[in-house]
Amino acid sequence: MLYDIARPFLFSLDAETAHEFTLAALNLAGRTLPAGKPEAADAVRVMGIDFPNRIGLAAGLDKNGEAIDGLARLGFGFIEIGTITPRPQPGNPRPRLFRLPEVRGIINRMGFNNHGVDTLVANVKAARFKGVLGINIGKNFDTPIENAADDYLACLDKVYPLASYVTVNISSPNTKNLRQLQGESELDDLLGRLKSAQQRLADQHGRYVPLTLKIAPDLEAAQITNIADALRRHRIDAVIATNTTISRDKVQGVRFAEQQGGLSGAPVFEASTAVVAQLATALGGELPIIAAGGVMDTRSARAKLEAGASLVQLYSGLIYRGPCLVRECVRATADFPR
């Protein structure tokens, strides 16, 4: 109800200013109001973690972990922050975030703008939140793609003690050549190095933190099969499907559709859900799938689970529907078979 009142004001601002205003409000709420708790549902065990409900926040809304306690008040079963890089970087020039309200879509070309992993670590340590926290890691824009693994490993070392799980983002379309890491040989090398580091860190900290891989929706069937094989071979703990799409098939003629960047929201739902279904077949239940992409209502949340996902993440849907979407989706997925 409150969001219905606030939305016209937020939509009167340019998209990134509205994003910044929302983060500031969540930050204030987190610092001044009692700690939040997840919307009630039967817990589900995924990656060895007990998630209080199946609905989580996708990475991208809170890149630096500034508003974790405020976000915790919205009822999520888990929160994913980032994408974070080893060094601070400004991202791409503004404007770089565009709403497509006619189709409930968003285009972004943010470019991993963030304050660097050390700032995120400090913010996580300062937060009161004790729930399931994912931390999404990436590479700096000026790190050569052949050295990308070094950036992921640097971030993993620093966030490992604080994360419930760590997501390796190789699928943003807004960092030059990043999606090359989804190639067969590149992915094999990256996952091998990450798995070795995970095992070393587990011994060092006496605690196993799962690794997930976030992939794109713009993949051929053979690529999905290759990725599934690599995930199994390197014993990665889960996969997130999917990131944003570079396709504009669903938004032809819509204002801002020509803007460069990744498209999210309702227009990516079908492609993203198809990847979930293909992954589910290719993986044969050997590791869980976390679905993201176009979850705008309870029907689309359940469709992700029916396609083979174990957990569901929201982001664009929050912008168009507000916090009520979290509660609705938790309730709609609470009775889904475990």
UniProtKB/Swiss-Prot annotation:
Top EC category: oxidoreductase
Xref: Pfam families: DHO_dh
GO biological process per UniProt: 'de novo' pyrimidine nucleobase biosynthetic process; 'de novo' UMP biosynthetic process
CDD domains assigned: DHOD_2_like
EC number(s) on file: 1.3.5.2
Cellular component GO terms, alphabetical: cytoplasm; plasma membrane
Stated name of the protein: Dihydroorotate dehydrogenase (quinone)
Source species taxonomy: Bacteria, Pseudomonadati, Pseudomonadota, Betaproteobacteria, Rhodocyclales
